[in-house]
């Protein structure tokens, strides 16, 4: 295992920023460290880098304890949100900086810099200064500079936050391809779940200093381990009494029981669109949101307001329209456990929506 973290804790005064966090990361994996602001993500990243010291706990790289090592002794590349490029240096000199500090021979230095210039798509920009580059180009320089000394671990603190949406989308795909080509273990902090889901091999979700769950994007979305993860990842509706919905009468209720229902677990439409009309219940369209490739439909069922998707290929619905609603499944949880509950009136499997 490349990285092993056990029982990591960090306080800032009375604030418990990181609370008993443990995890392993395999070599070459790209990890998305995801969570709301103040959840402890950046604190974990800075402790891995040696920029902060943990109050207690162990950090090991390839089995070696590194708690006592200085940042420059850990073999880490760090990419900051604001690029942190040297304004008075050209692209070439920015990338070469770490190699010069390590006193790499000139011929080897030039070869490595030009290799990274080519790898990051910066050919022809070697003599330009940071102010002559776009935001996306500056971030590529920052990546190249971090990779130049051939670190064993690459850490990225919200690397796309300062870049506009279109370029950010392009850089996501580019980063994924770059990491795969270089084969370096990488961890990036983000509060953007779409970014984490699209780019990462695995996601670690943090909240209030605790690691809530670690797993592949698919596993975390389909099998959330805690109510926080279930509500944080993806779009969903939270319901206090799921037993009021048709097919879930025996699911239980009470102050401790709650249900989370994702949009894809719900079908909405006119009566003739359902093969099993007896399983559906009446709803009223509250609001429609056009999302480019589909409609997001808010529908009222009794006292509950649910959200679901509707294909553009189906007849358009209108606010106030009476429709039929089928809830296929719900994610239920209480103080002791969580589980997926299927609609007990259903016979045929839930259709796959592509």
Region locations from a protein language model:
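ABC ATPase nucleotide-binding domain helices that frame the ATP-binding cleft
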Residues: 42-45, 141
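Conserved ABC transporter NBD signature motif
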Residues: 57-65
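ABC ATPase nucleotide-binding domains
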Residues: 30, 69-225
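The feature captures the beta-strand-to-loop junction immediately N-terminal to the Walker
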Residues: 34-36
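Non-catalytic connector elements of ABC transporters
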Residues: 236, 247-354
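Helix-to-loop junction immediately C-terminal to a conserved catalytic motif
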Residues: 49
């Amino acid at each position: 295992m490349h990285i092993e973290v056990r029982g990591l804790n960090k306080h800032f005064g009375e604030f418990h920023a990181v609370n008993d966090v443990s995890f392993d990361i395999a070599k070459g994996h790209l990890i998305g460290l995801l969570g709301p602001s103040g959840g402890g993500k950046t604190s974990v990243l800075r402790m891995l880098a040696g920029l902060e010291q943990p109050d207690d706990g162990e950090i090991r790289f390839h089995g070696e304890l590194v708690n006592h090592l200085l940042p420059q002794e850990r073999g880490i590349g760090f990419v900051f949100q604001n690029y942190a490029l040297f304004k008075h240096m050209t692209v070439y000199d920015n990338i070469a900086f770490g190699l010069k500090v390590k006193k790499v021979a000139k011929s080897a230095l030039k070869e490595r810099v030009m290799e990274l210039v080519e790898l990051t798509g910066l050919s022809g920009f070697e003599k330009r200064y940071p102010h002559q580059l776009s935001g996306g180009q500056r971030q590529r320089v920052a990546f190249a500079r971090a990779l130049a000394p051939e670190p064993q671990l690459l850490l990225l603190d919200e690397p796309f936050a300062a870049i506009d949406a279109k370029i950010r989308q392009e850089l996501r795909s580019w980063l994924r391809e770059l990491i795969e080509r270089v084969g370096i273990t990488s961890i990036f902090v983000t509060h953007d779940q779409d970014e984490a889901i699209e780019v990462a091999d695995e996601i670690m979700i943090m909240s209030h200093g605790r690691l809530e769950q670690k797993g592949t994007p698919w596993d975390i979305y389909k099998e959330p381990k805690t109510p926080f993860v279930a509500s944080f990842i993806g779009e969903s509706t939270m319901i206090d009494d799921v037993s009021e919905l048709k097919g879930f009468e025996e699911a239980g209720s009470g102050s401790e029981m709650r249900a989370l229902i994702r949009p894809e677990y719900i079908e909405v439409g006119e009566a003739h669109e359902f093969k099993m009309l007896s399983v559906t219940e009446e709803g009223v369209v509250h609001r429609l949101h056009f999302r480019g490739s589909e409609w997001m439909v808010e529908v009222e069922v009794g006292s509950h307001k649910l959200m679901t998707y509707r294909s553009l290929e189906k007849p358009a619905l209108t606010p106030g329209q009476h429709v039929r609603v089928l809830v296929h499944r719900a994610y239920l949880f209480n103080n002791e456990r969580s589980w997926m509950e299927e609609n007990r009136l259903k016979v045929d499997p839930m259709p796959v929506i592509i």
